[in-house]
Design a protein with these regions (language model features):
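Positively charged, small/polar-rich N-terminal and surface patches that mediate targeting and assembly
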Residues: 1-134
């Protein structure tokens, strides 16, 4: 599992967190994250690109992207609203995995594994759509 490092491709033109093509899954502990990553790897659902985000990483790298924009770009605010949810959970010690989304079938298989561990939120970032996977 890779450590997360924010990249421009994970941001909107406004600079807000929006990792298109990824599932963003928050779990209550590092133990749950490791259990999930192991299940994904053993089922060949992890291509080695799954990223771990500790609560500190979420607070330091993801949270500051909310509200970076000025008034020059329109937005419905969904991106910032999601980041605020992530912030609240990170403050409680939750961490996250970012998993490549792939096809609908791949996503279903990943979510079958996600549901084997306690998880707090699961979102799939697609082009122009954040899909709630709960």
């Amino acid at each position: 599992m890779k450590d997360f490092k924010i990249a421009n491709r994970m941001l909107t033109i406004r600079g807000e967190f929006y990792p298109t093509g990824f599932l963003f899954v928050m779990v209550p502990s590092l133990e749950a994250a490791n259990t999930l990553e192991s299940a994904l790897r053993s089922s060949h659902l992890d291509d080695g690109d799954t990223m771990l985000l500790t609560s500190e990483t979420i607070l330091e790298q993801i949270v500051p992207t909310a509200g970076r924009h000025g008034d020059n770009f329109p937005s419905v605010g969904t991106e910032s609203a999601m980041v605020h949810k992530y912030r609240r959970l990170a403050l409680e010690g939750h961490c996250a995995l970012m998993i490549k989304g792939g096809s609908a079938e791949h996503t279903r298989q990943v979510m079958d594994k996600v549901r084997t561990v306690p998880f707090s939120i699961a979102e799939k970032y697609r082009f122009l759509v954040i899909e709630d996977m709960d």
